Amino acid sequence: MERAITPEKRDDDLQFDATLRPRTLQDYIGQEKIRENLKLFIDAAKGRSEALDHVLLYGPPGLGKTTLANIIACEMGVNIKSTSGPVIERPGDLAAILTNLEPHDVLFIDEIHRLSHVVEEILYPAMEDFQLDIIIGQGPSARSIKLDLPRFTLVGATTRAGLLSSPLRDRFGVISRLEFYTHDELAFIVTRSARILGMAIDREGALELARRSRGTPRIANRLLRRVRDYAQVRADGAITLSVVQETLRLLEIDEMGFDQMDRMILLTIIDKFGGGPVGLDTIGAAIGEESDTIEDVYEPFLIQNGFLNRTPRGRVATPAAYQHFGRLTPERPQGSLF
């Protein structure tokens, strides 16, 4: 069964997200500094009748990068073309997209860190000079021609900004990191989503759902769907604190927003490896999960909330992790082997 609290996109999220997605910066909740800056830059670009500078959005999955890309296009009054790094396999794929853009259009590339180097090299002159270099012919007779492109805005999104090459990163005029959301912000998002779906939810229920959503709107909205199911079948249709608590108990999501996999990671470090330090590959082998998945999907929330430390020697469970599971914190310094 798929995790209810994975921040990664799932197929069943697509239609639901489209229904709930805000269309304007005014409707967008959270990320105050990013919203303020984007409004300034968009207003300035529209005032000059120019395309917005290229924008790079990075941060953990599920925080609203795709939503912001769509809002940018909406606020600019232009079309958006969406694709992703893995889909653009050849330079010709990118060339076909670029040549079909209209002036000031937004090109959104999700997982932009997964573009191949060959495709990236096509993107450099397109971003900087709005030109496309095309090679005609082969061998000594090959020649390069330049095609002019309309001035467009590239919005790139990534969960791993460190994997972007410097030449690509340096071509973005606006670079913004999305942060995890506060409980109050998520409660507002849940309340707004419930209203759009025609559901009644009280303040306590919204806050409880927010507290268990790992600071991530995508998770909050997904859990809201499950709570809605419970309220419809086993309650009177209204979402209250007790309805939220009982739904999440059935889903095995505890008061910190941990599910079985989170608990497995922390308990593996505590019980099998003495609290750490232990390498990521070793943890992955012990629980049967890819180390990249642990690093990208599970770790950010555990580290952000003080349950896991990342050290040069490996991962270490913190005293908060021991307390959460009712374990005594070791008196010896973490990581001492002898």
Swiss-Prot record:
> Which residue ranges are recorded for the region named Large ATPase domain (RuvB-L)?
1-181
Q: Does the keyword Transmembrane helix apply?
A: no
The segments labelled Small ATPAse domain (RuvB-S) in the record are 182-252
Q: Entry's SMART domains?
A: AAA
Q: Which domain of life is it from?
A: Bacteria
Pfam families per record: AAA_lid_4, RuvB_C, RuvB_N
* Gene3D superfamilies, A to Z: 1.10.8.60, P-loop containing nucleotide triphosphate hydrolases, Winged helix-like DNA-binding domain superfamily/Winged helix DNA-binding domain
Query: Where DNA is bound, by residue?
Result: 310, 315
Q: What is its main location?
A: cytoplasm
Question: So where does ATP get bound?
Answer: 20-21, 62, 65-67, 128-130, 171, 181, 218
InterPro entries given in the database record: AAA+_ATPase, AAA_lid_4, DNA_helicase_Holl-junc_RuvB, P-loop_NTPase, RuvB-like_N, RuvB_C, WH-like_DNA-bd_sf, WH_DNA-bd_sf
Span list, region Head domain (RuvB-H): 255-338
Reactions this protein catalyses: ATP + H2O = ADP + phosphate + H(+)
A biological process term (GO) from this entry: DNA repair
What CDD domains does UniProt report for this protein, alphabetically?
A: AAA
- Keyword Transmembrane helix appears in the UniProt entry: no
Family label: Belongs to the RuvB family.
Comment text on domains: Has 3 domains, the large (RuvB-L) and small ATPase (RuvB-S) domains and the C-terminal head (RuvB-H) domain. The head domain binds DNA, while the ATPase domains jointly bind ATP, ADP or are empty depending on the state of the subunit in the translocation cycle. During a single DNA translocation step the structure of each domain remains the same, but their relative positions change.
Q: Which HAMAP family match?
A: DNA_HJ_migration_RuvB
Quote the subunit structure annotation. Homohexamer. Forms an RuvA(8)-RuvB(12)-Holliday junction (HJ) complex. HJ DNA is sandwiched between 2 RuvA tetramers; dsDNA enters through RuvA and exits via RuvB. An RuvB hexamer assembles on each DNA strand where it exits the tetramer. Each RuvB hexamer is contacted by two RuvA subunits (via domain III) on 2 adjacent RuvB subunits; this complex drives branch migration. In the full resolvosome a probable DNA-RuvA(4)-RuvB(12)-RuvC(2) complex forms which resolves the HJ.
This chain's protein is named Holliday junction branch migration complex subunit RuvB
Provide the taxonomic classification: Bacteria, Pseudomonadati, Thermodesulfobacteriota, Desulfuromonadia, Geobacterales
